[in-house]
Curated annotation (Swiss-Prot):
Protein's recorded name: Pyridoxal 5'-phosphate synthase subunit PdxT
Role played: Catalyzes the hydrolysis of glutamine to glutamate and ammonia as part of the biosynthesis of pyridoxal 5'-phosphate. The resulting ammonia molecule is channeled to the active site of PdxS.
Gene this protein is translated from: pdxT
Keywords, ordered alphabetically: Glutamine amidotransferase, Hydrolase, Lyase, Pyridoxal phosphate
Pfam families reported in the protein's UniProt record: SNO
Species for this entry: Mycobacteroides abscessus (strain ATCC 19977 / DSM 44196 / CCUG 20993 / CIP 104536 / JCM 13569 / NCTC 13031 / TMC 1543 / L948)
EC number, as in UniProt: 4.3.3.6, 3.5.1.2
Cystine pairings recorded for this chain: none
Annotated metabolic or biological route of this protein: Cofactor biosynthesis; pyridoxal 5'-phosphate biosynthesis
Keyword Hydrolase: yes
Length: 193
């Protein structure tokens, strides 16, 4: 049976993640309400704008239920803004920004620069064969990881893909490249969870 993976559908590149999850053998559901969050076996937090997503988590009354599900071990994958939200500490953000603490890491928002500084490149990604083409759009990077955090890929000397237990995060956007290996890894994590 295919796992049901939610995509936080408050803002960001939701459709692209839904398509990537379906291509990876999962059923996908846009999550906008606590009752939808309660149905899923795993959750993707997409790219977008992390401070806006922080506010929308409160507006849609998802912050507390999401925090509870993450503490209970819900498998989660965050790309770009999703990586920022999953961090235990966020640098260069507003004081009211949400840090869900699903991964013991310090992340710097927009670390690679502004929109004009966005770039693409090939990465070595632990656990997948061959180079992975990565698209970085106003991307964060990781400045510190805890002892239990595995660094899966780095760019320009900084971690850009990490995993801790049932939580996975990338600074880049695999959903826009057509390469489904990150999503397949996450769907496999959900199945194993």
């Amino acid at each position: 049976m295919s796992p049901l993976v939610g995509v936080l559908a408050l803002q960001g590149d939701v459709r692209e993640h839904v398509a990537a999850l379906k291509d990876s053998g999962a059923e996908a559901l846009g999550v906008r309400r606590p009752e939808e969050l309660g149905k899923v076996d795993g959750l993707v937090i997409p790219g977008g704008e992390s401070t806006t997503m922080s506010n929308l988590l409160r507006v849609f009354e998802l912050l507390d239920p999401l925090t509870e599900r993450l503490r209970a071990g819900l498998p989660v994958y965050g790309s770009c803004a999703g990586m920022i939200l999953l961090a235990s500490e966020i640098l260069d953000t507003r004081p009211d920004a949400v840090a869900l603490g699903a991964i013991d890491m310090t992340v710097r928002r927009n670390a690679f620069g502004r929109q004009v500084d966005s770039f693409e490149g090939d990465l070595d990604f632990t656990g997948v064969d061959g180079a992975m083409h990565a698209v970085f759009i106003r991307a964060p990077w990781v400045e510190r990881v805890g002892d239990d955090v595995e660094v899966l890929a780095s760019a320009q000397g900084h971690p850009v893909a990490v995993r801790q237990g049932s939580a996975l995060a990338t600074a880049f956007h695999p959903e826009v490249t057509g390469d489904r290996r990150v999503h397949q890894l996450f769907v496999d994590m959900v199945r194993a969870g």
